[in-house]
Amino acid sequence: MTTTDIKNSIIPYIGETVPYINIPENIIFNGHTIETEISGQDFSNENLTHLLKILASLGSCSLYKLLNNSSKEKIYFLGEKLRIRKLSYRPIPDTITITGGSYLESKRKGKSCLNVKDKQSGEILYSFELDYYIISQDSFRLFYKDFFNDTPIGTYDEKLPEGKINKTKDHYQLTISIMPFTLNQCKGHFENYPIVPFVFIANCVLREIFNFLGNRDIYEIDSLEGYASKAMPIGTEFQVEVFQQKFLRNLIYFKCEIKDTSGNSYAVIIINIKSETQK
């Protein structure tokens, strides 16, 4: 199965749609494993979420193939828990390969495990895991009926909302304000049920953290974990409560809880950021 096959026989039947879903042009399915490569993209700092988006899209496609669905009704793959870890501290090369696959834990849960490698040396650069809930179309519509919105969406807006760091008197605590997401920014996730993608909120949080740290070129993400507890609506201002602590001379830990202005919690992101100058 190639990228063309995936676009024709898988993507129309999963919850994510274009332009949100993002897969490379040279995918090969070999049994239950998936292989592809990417060139010329910047995954530094908050741009690591662009890689997460690609990996999550590949995981959804791989799980759909495993299900061998013949009903032609949409199946929704909702991320429960995400983990990515950097395993090499060499500079990320221009061309990387992605290999791995997905497996089913049950009819309602699945997992994707992928490695990002240096194409030339074969060295593993990142390990990635994503746990999914697998939901039928009818169940999705029932669970998320309050999100239904059939307003026609025009141009896809790739620019994410602005944010602001709010320092507190406590050295270990700060907050991040993130302006509301729009329909256009969340186009394709999911069709007629606009939900803010986890990778988008993570991008905004990381962007503000790197701005807070300053001198962005000396830092890199060592690991990132995310746990979603509730779907994030558009049109809502988010307040991110951040706890930070330097565990090692060159490693800073951040725990970020995403809430709305009423205090409702939606997700937690745990990030370890390493200073490149002291490795």
Predicted regions and their residues:
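Extended aliphatic helical segments
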Residues: 18, 116, 196-199, 205, ...
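Hydrophobic beta-strand-centered segment that forms part of the acyl-chain substrate-binding groove
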Residues: 59-107, 126-129, 205-253, 268-270
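Non-catalytic linker/capping segments at the edges of enzyme domains
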Residues: 1-46, 105-111, 117, 123, ...
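A conserved, well-ordered hydrophobic junction motif at loop->secondary-structure transitions
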Residues: 29-69, 171-220
